Structures are given as C-alpha cells and as structure tokens.
Amino acid sequence: MSRIPTRELGRYLLQGQICQRGCVASSVSKSRAKQLGRHPLLPHDRHQPTQARHAHTVTTTATPTQLAPSVPLRKKLKDEAKQLKKNAKKDNRKGSNQTVDGWELTVGIEIHAQLNTARKLFSPAATSFNDAPNSHVALFDLSMPGSQPLLQKETLIPALRAALALNCDIQPISRFDRKHYFWWDQPSGYQITQYYEPFARNGQITLFARDGIAPEDGESVTIGIQQVQMEQDTAKTLAQPGDTHWLDFNRVGVPLIEIITKPELHHPRTAAVFVRKMQTLLNAVDACVSGMETGGLRADVNVSVRRTSDASAPLGTRTEIKNLSTIKAVEDAIIAERDRQIQELEAGGTIAGETRGWTLGTKQTRRLRGKEGEVDYRYMPDPDLGPLIIADDLVDHIRKSVAYLPDHELSELADVYGLTAKDALSLLSLDNGGRIEYFYNVVESFGTRLQQGTEGGLDVRAYAPLAANWILHEFGRLVDDDSDNESTPFEVSPDGQCERVPVESLAELLFHLQQKKITGKVAKELLTALHQGNLADAENITAAIDAHDLWFHELSTEEYQELAALAVEGEDKVLREFRDKKVFPQGKLMYLVGKMLRLGATERIDPSNAEKFMRAKVEELL
C-alpha cells in the first residue's frame, strides 16, 4: 500500500479540509469490519483526487455532489420513531402496566452525560458540536502514534459539581483504566474510563410523588448511586445511502460522566422519572448543558425479574438495553423487556445475559449481542496516566458554589409563586434551564408594572401563575408553529432571554391582559405578531393596541342584563332543570353563558362577568 504524505494526512485529520461533508467515509459493512479485525479509517488512495477515488468505490458509484444529504443517525431514528408512533395503538390503561402480579421487577440505570467543558478530556481540542465535521481533532483523539493523553484539569470541575449534587463521597485518589473493544468510532481500540477506582462513590437521589413516580412507590423513593466515573465519548456515526457510514471525530474524547445506580428501581415509570430528574439536576448545577433531545445524555437500563413468592431468591439474570434516547423510551423499553422475560420464564425457558436494543414506537426489544463482562473488556490500568488526586479544599469550594438544586426550587415555585408541581417541573426542564430563567425575568418585570401605585405591594402568587401558563402553553403553540417556519427558531438562552419574544414585551402584554384592558383572544393575536417579528418591543405592543383599537370596551351593567335576558328566552326546558335538580346544574349555566357570548359582541364580553350576570338572571327567574 502506498504511503500517504504526512502533510496531507495532517491537513486532512487536523484541519477538517476534506471533501463535501467533511467526514471519514467507511464503505465496509460492520460484519466485514469484524472479519478484517480492524475498522477502516482511510481509503488507501486518500491522496488521489476526489473523482478518482470515487470512480472505483465498491459501494458508492455517485460522486460527492450526487450523494443524498447527510442525515445524522440519531435524527434518522427519531424520524422513523415518529412514524411508528403514529401507527401504534394508544394504551389507555394509564398506570396499569407498572406491576405484574407474582413478579418483581428490578432495574439499574447507567447514564452517560456530556460534561459542560470547553476542552476534551485528554486533549486540548475544543468540544464544539456545531462546527464542521472533523474540525476539532487533536493527534491523541485519533490515536496517532506517539501521541499521549494529557488530562485537561478544567474538565474535573463540572464532574465534581455533578457528583456533589448527587450526594456522593468524593474519592481523594482515583485512577483511569482502559476498556478494550474494537469498533470504528473508537480509533484507539479502547476507551479510557474509571472502572475500578472512580472519583465519586455512594451517592443518592430522592424522587418524590410530585416528580411523577409510580403510585406504588408512595410519597418518595431514594435511589442509591453506586459510583460516578469520568470517561471518553466516541465518534459520531452518520449513516449514508447503501452500506456506508461517515465518521465525525469532533466527538471523540469529549468528557463524559457515567452515573451508575444501584439496582433499586422497581417500576418503569419511576425509572423514567429518575432519568428526567437526573437530566434536570445535572443542568441545574451546570455540569451538563444538553439533554437527551440533542444526544448529550444517554441511558442504558439493566432489567431483571424474579418471582415474589420466594423472598430469599437472588435477583434474576439481567439484560441491558443500550442507548435509550428519550424519557418515554426508558419506560416503554423496560416494560417491553420485563414482559418478555416473564413470558420466557413462565414458558419454562431461561434468561440469557445479553445486550438488547429498542426502537422507539415498538412494543418489543431485540437481541444485539451477548453481554460483555469484565473479562471481555480486558480492563487494565492506563499506563500513560497517573492517579487523579482531588484535594479537600477544592471539594469544599465547589460544594459551596453548587447552584440551587431542583428540589428546593420546586418547593419555592409551589410555595412562593403558587405554581402547580406540573408547571414547575416543566419550567425547570425546558430549554436546558433557560425557560425557568425567562419565567423569573418576566415575573419580575410583570410585577414591577403591577405594583406601580399599589400600596403595600402585591403577592406574587396573584400573577405568577398567569405568566407560567403563557410561558408554557402559549409558547408551546408558538414552538409548534416553528415546525413550518424557516425564520429564526424560537429559542430561550440560558440566562432567560428570548429574541423572538423579549421579556419586557411579554410582561407588557400580560399586564394589559391581567388588568382586563385587552381580551385573551387579542393577547394571543399580539403574541403571534410578536413571535413573527411584527412587533419589536413593549412600546409597539401598546401602540398596536391603540392603532387598531384593540382595547377591551366592556359592556355596561345594563347591557349585560339585557343580554342575559335575551339568552334565556325560549329556554324554558333548561330553566326547569334549575328548579328540579337538587345539585346546581353548572353545565346548564355555562350553556346559557355560551349563548350570551354568541349573541353579544364577544370582544366586549368578559366571560367571568357574563357568568355572574347569567347566574343572577337564573336565580331571579326561579
């Protein structure tokens, strides 16, 4: 084989100057790669012109300009999952599948989360995920001969924040190991991890009923954390037409933490809640900034079952389901695997320890391979890395600087701001923490307007729920509209700012709505206009209301009374129900209120006042 010029190889691998999409093309199938005992990284004729190389490619006959657009494997799977979900039948028996009579489910979870760092774990290359493929790659990332790992000290800080948030004991001395396996996304043939001596052990996290755990778990359940370890991420694989995969090595060496729980989860819904709360917690302490939706957090679940009739029996043989990419997938995959194991055991079979896969939208798991063990991975201490020594003063400093934890914030949102647990959880989990900061900013601006001229102040519980409702539900409508909108996407920054709907603009809109100066319908129309860029600031909202005479000119008392009298005409049958029923028929009253709204000028009617006047009219006629 001809030697590739060193200069061209270096330019290709380290500066991202490659054809089209900038990824290393692999046209050898997985099975073929295993037969060869290696993974193909570079074609032997890499130094030839692009057209010459593709002229004799085995699996691809088109030139790069003729190839279909690159689709990341994760996006491809999600698109397929959406289609499967549309075709799947809905299970209306909510909560009925958390237990199976006569059987106990046991689940342990391994979470892999990308740390919020500027550098990779053992090289100075940047950890940017939005730049051109293979543009942030160091020599060590590709395992070039002679390259050595050098621990980037700053990567330890977010890892410590995560471990302390999980109530772990930080180990003063930890060490790095090599976990050997061969695949094309790991150039070195091994992953550097901390299998034997991790930097954190013996943590715990408590899940509460407000988090959404299974009713069978009661008011709360505490899950033990066995250990937290640092390790490297692998390359990103992009599937191409035919049996071809492209590799983006920007992700190789990105620092991860692996969080390993004890096998103390016994209900699928609680396991899913655990993953969701873990994602929220890691984001809250600024340890990780991307979640499952962007591939920044992945979950593996270990599932086993045993009969409840024998309390002394050991745990059953476990199987592992890899790379679950959504919270819902965690619950569904556990249910499917639990049911499969129970069916197998009840039929007289046995459970094999193996790794299984799961496809979103399906009802069953599938076998991938036999379960690897400690011997298979040939763990060994990494001879190129010394022990990691963590001083007590560093741990104390980080412990004091750890941010407000979600459980405390949830209590404050409920007790101080008057939000429901569901709304509080949603605000904390959306936009990687940006949505809750946006909420605080809007409430502050909203409250300032309301309290001007108010003696003694105004309880925040009087207006914060309105802000939360709009920030969650009306914003949800705007996000749905973005699916067909090619303009700037709807985004909220980590510090709670939104370019499409500025804080001051929403606060001004909500102020007019709360003061009943505009109707809810008008407020929604103004929000849509703001979202589409037709309104730029708070002054323009007020100006738009003035210009189009959108102010709420409510009916007078006499007009409400006349409208109520008109609405009850010809409704003798409905009115008789008010006389005959022992319980006040609220539904019939709202029917009459709806008739009022249809008969009158909707833009001048306050529904709550309409109900009040209609109730008075009905009582007058009884």
Swiss-Prot record:
This is Glutamyl-tRNA(Gln) amidotransferase subunit B, mitochondrial. Pfam families: GatB_N, GatB_Yqey. Residues 1-54 form a transit peptide. PANTHER family: GLUTAMYL-TRNA GLN AMIDOTRANSFERASE SUBUNIT B MITOCHONDRIAL AND PROKARYOTIC PET112-RELATED, GLUTAMYL-TRNA(GLN) AMIDOTRANSFERASE SUBUNIT B, MITOCHONDRIAL. It is found in: Mitochondrion. Keywords: ATP-binding, Ligase, Mitochondrion, Nucleotide-binding, Protein biosynthesis, Transit peptide. Residues 30-67 are annotated as: Disordered. Its main location: mitochondrion. Residues 57-67 have a biased composition (Low complexity). Belongs to the GatB/GatE family. GatB subfamily.
